[in-house]
Regions:
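Conserved glycine(s) of the Walker
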Residues: 252-254
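Short capping segments at the starts of secondary-structure elements
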Residues: 45-56
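Short, well-structured alpha-helical segments that form the helix of a local strand-helix-strand
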Residues: 57-61
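A noncatalytic interaction/capping subdomain that flanks phosphate/NTP-handling catalytic cores
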Residues: 3-26, 39, 62, 66-76, ...
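A structural micro-motif at secondary-structure boundaries
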Residues: 27-33
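Hydrophobic positions on the alpha1 helix immediately C-terminal to the Walker A/P-loop
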Residues: 257
Length: 388
């Protein structure tokens, strides 16, 4: 379905109909456009009916000009040309839906089925361990790379803005800008997260592919949250067949701490930077995902959650400090990077953090960077296991 973009108005000047830009469209140096009687009719239909399909417009033209059905194919061709011209000029927009016929790759990450469209060389090799085949009906999210700039820049209301991204809300979609990622023009996502379109440069340079990989994470975490899965900024290891997460502010030493576990106790690494959690059959689980910061450490497997160790710095000693129940919930939520663009999303994050704190160990370890730090944490975890 095609809809009129905001920022254009139909005006008649000395008997001639013009589409004239205003506001941001003038700032973007958009030009006016002359319309004949038929084009004026089509614009009015689009504007006053909140959108229409090409065939619907062709049939309306046939009725208006008293043409029989044999003329509809030719009318449809003319209507399509008109819509394409206005779309390319940014005066109308098409409802977000896949343009490509067949997906380039299909992948399953934490049980979420994603069909991806676009040049395969633009998708990071980190996705390859997650490639799976599944039916179209099982698709949770479609993601399409369009290797050209968007036809228009009408962004909407700002929800969030920082140096990494700006998120705008429109009636039917979110629009995201990534100012630090020069190869990504912008991205559009339906409000339910089921379809994402990323406008990007076609060059498959290493940094370009890395930028796209990082951008795709945002849209994955959006749909994951809707499926009850939440991401915590943390490094993880496998101990006693359970995933243990170590989390702290940047520079707090989570990578150093998991490295000590790996070296001292032979604990396998799971993920070096990000862990996705959810509930399955009444049990909290940690799911393998490809995003792992710069560590290069990730797994495709899933494990029961053992608990979370929140790390703090002490220059001389290693010891555990008891946290109040509310503080456990708050600190776990603060380590989440699942979307909190709107109040509802914040509430979902808070609810899940409370579920973790109510049912799993959440330890607060003040520690050095010495081997004794890992030993202190291990002793505490072993004592917890003995009590169960």
């Amino acid at each position: 379905m095609f809809k009129c973009q905001p920022g254009y108005t139909l005006r008649k000047i000395k008997g001639v109909s013009y589409l004239l830009p205003y506001g941001q469209q003038i700032a973007d140096q958009k030009k006016g456009f002359v319309l004949n009687d038929t084009s004026t009719f089509l614009w009015n239909v689009l504007q006053h009916n909140e959108g229409a399909e090409p065939l619907q417009l062709a049939e309306m033209l046939a009725r208006t000009y008293h043409l029989d059905e044999s003329n509809i194919p030719e009318l449809l061709s003319d209507v399509t040309d008109f819509l394409t011209q206005l779309t390319n000029m940014g005066m109308i927009t098409e409802t977000l839906q896949t343009i490509s016929r067949e997906p380039s790759v299909s992948m399953m990450i934490a049980g979420i089925c994603i069909r991806a469209y676009g040049p395969t060389e633009l998708f990071s090799s980190c996705f390859e361990p997650f490639y799976r085949e599944f039916s179209e009906d099982d698709t949770d999210q479609e993601l399409e790379l369009i290797t050209s700039p968007p036809p228009s820049r009408s962004y909407g209301q700002v929800l969030l803005q920082n140096f990494e991204m700006t998120i705008f809300e429109n009636p039917d979609r979110y629009i995201i800008l990534f100012p630090q990622m020069k190869n990504i023009y912008e991205a559009h996502m339906l409000k339910d997260g089921s379809y994402v379109r990323i406008y990007c440069h076609p060059e498959a340079a290493v940094q370009n592919v890395e930028n796209l990989f990082h951008a795709i994470r945002l849209f994955f975490l959006f749909i994951a949250q809707k499926r009850g899965l939440f991401a915590i900024h943390s490094a993880s290891i496998l101990y006693q067949e359970k995933a243990w997460l170590f989390s702290g502010h940047s520079g707090m030493g989570k990578s150093t701490h998991t490295a000590l576990w790996h070296e001292l106790f032979g604990s396998p690494y799971l993920n070096g930077d990000l862990n996705l959690l959810g509930s399955e059959n009444g049990r909290l689980m940690v799911y393998g995902i490809p995003w792992c910061g710069t560590s290069g450490i990730f797994t495709t497997r899933q494990y029961p959650l053992g608990g979370i160790v929140l790390l703090g710095r002490d220059p001389q000693a290693d010891y555990l400090k008891e946290l109040e129940p509310s503080e456990k919930v708050l600190r776990v939520m603060q380590r989440m990077i699942s979307p909190a663009w709107k109040e509802r999303q914040l509430s979902e994050n808070l609810f899940f953090a409370e579920e973790i704190a109510d049912h799993m160990p959440v330890l607060y370890l003040l520690c050095t960077k010495n081997p004794s730090a890992a030993l202190t944490a291990k002793n505490a975890i072993d004592n917890l296991e003995d009590l169960q």
